[in-house]
Amino acid sequence: MIEKNKSLSVFLLHFLERLNGCESIEKKITESLTDICTFYKFKKGFVYQTDGFRYFFLKETIGNEDHSLKRRFEMSEMTKIHSDRMKVKNRPFYASRNDDNSLVDIDVLDFHKTDSLLVRQFEDSEGKIIGFIGFADREDTTPFTDEELQTIHLLLGSLSKEIAVRE
């Protein structure tokens, strides 16, 4: 347990140093996605952002060599039920086909063509969803603890502020 906490501390320090560094926003985002994928054992990381009118566009991706993630999709394709389900306060949405899931969770997994999915939406100042950061196909089947989900929520919140700046 001590080794895991030490590893997490090093990861968090490195992550926050990067976000506070002088690198380009694109480099910060790509390296952050890569590090989160590595640390939490996800095969894919991605960022979708809206054009403000009709579509969500795939802006960054890690591990999507098979091109299974949609390059774009209409906002209306992500139903209100999906959006509400993924908009859990103080924690990201997480579902895995290995878990006992609701039909809505399975529908979200099917929509993204993945076996497991972690997503945190981000909003503009008016509360409108302008994008989301996600990770898919986790190799580790150990469920996340509430503390881990809250940590990920905070990390992705910091990263989402960097992403929103470029809009």
Residue ranges and their predicted role:
Residues 92-116, 137-138:
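Signal-transducing coupling segments at domain and membrane junctions
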